[in-house]
Amino acid sequence: MDKKKHDSHQHEKKADASQEKVEVAQPVSDADRIKELEEALAAKGLESAANWDKYLRERADLENYRKRVQKEKEEILKYGKEEIIVEILPALDNLERAIDHANEESAIVEGVRLTLSMLLSALKKFGVTPVDTPPGTPFNPEYHQAMGQVESADQEPNTVVAVFQKGYLLNERLLRPAMVTVAVKA
């Protein structure tokens, strides 16, 4: 009989607990439910606005990336040939020296002149131009490299006296400075 009492007592406890649960889960009033839904809607609206803002930022980043890549491609096309041109310049210098030091006018000298002219013409098509540095030109460290100084009464101080080696530009960007001597006061 004790066992029956004990079982019935446990059964009563379970019944009380289930009634408490039922009491807790009573239906919410319509006004409270509407308020909850409005709050949830407002939260989702904020989340949506944040996601839209994030989307716009990512899209702008992508557009900036595309522009940067396009600019880099243009730079590569414009200056990508720089290495090979720098390697060709010493051969160009040697052709000029050969013409300058030729003792006679011969077919070989004329052939070297023609070769030099063709090479300069081809380089010009790719945007290569010599740095114009006649004697008397003011020394410009952006385009000239001073190899020495010479006292001169004939020339203004800080002007080019002689050019040892021509300088070259590639699309207005310096490839190699002109090697020059510079006048100083006598």
Swiss-Prot record:
General function of this protein: Participates actively in the response to hyperosmotic and heat shock by preventing the aggregation of stress-denatured proteins, in association with DnaK and GrpE. It is the nucleotide exchange factor for DnaK and may function as a thermosensor. Unfolded proteins bind initially to DnaJ; upon interaction with the DnaJ-bound protein, DnaK hydrolyzes its bound ATP, resulting in the formation of a stable complex. GrpE releases ADP from DnaK; ATP binding to DnaK triggers the release of the substrate protein, thus completing the reaction cycle.
CDD domains cross-referenced by the UniProt entry: GrpE
Superkingdom per UniProt: Bacteria
Record-given protein name: Protein GrpE
UniProt KW keywords: Chaperone, Cytoplasm, Stress response
GO cellular component: cytosol
SUPFAM superfamilies: Coiled-coil domain of nucleotide exchange factor GrpE (SSF58014), Head domain of nucleotide exchange factor GrpE (SSF51064)
GO biological process: protein folding
Compartmental location: Cytoplasm
Region of interest: Disordered: 1-29
PROSITE patterns: GRPE (PS01071)
Family, per entry: Belongs to the GrpE family.
The organism of origin for this protein: Geobacter sp. (strain M21)
Single Gene Ontology MF annotation: adenyl-nucleotide exchange factor activity
Biased composition (Basic and acidic residues): 1-23
Subunit organization: Homodimer.
UniProt xrefs under PANTHER family: GRPE PROTEIN, GRPE PROTEIN HOMOLOG, MITOCHONDRIAL
